[in-house]
């Protein structure tokens, strides 16, 4: 698993993509953790920016703690996507008054297995929580439920991560 990246002083690259880690958390039934953005009718996987010079795995664990209250001992890393996956933001989401302009996200995605009790999940540990609700969903449901501009990335992420779950020590998706 690639763990180091260098964004010098900005997490936005020369092409305008913000570096980000995404988290796909599975339970022992092969379902996926699905979180509702605070105050919105929008559901997604946890994700967040990578700080300059921050190793990917460290960023993932930081986001895991900030967004859903889990610690490294609560999860097992099953794998990570091989490459950066990108999506462009629709025009209405681009902040044109900030520099550098962020026109989208480039993400590395981690597949994690929850160890132990789901009661460890806490959405209220951050000063500015991202989510106000969560649920377990069937493996492929997020592709159709996420906001439209993220669907292609979600499909690619789940297609790649599904292979890791099918490995001898993994779960079968949807079981």
Give residue spans per PLM region.
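A periodicity- and composition-biased signal for non-globular, repetitive helical segments
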Residues: 24, 53, 156-157
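Active-site beta-strand termini and strand-to-loop segments that position acidic
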Residues: 25-28, 37, 112-114
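A conserved beta-turn-beta hairpin within the catalytic core of GNAT-like acetyltransferases
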Residues: 39-41
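A short gly/proline-enriched turn/hairpin at secondary-structure junctions
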Residues: 44-48
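Charged phosphate-binding loop/patch that engages nucleotide di/tri-phosphates or the phosphate backbone
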Residues: 139-175
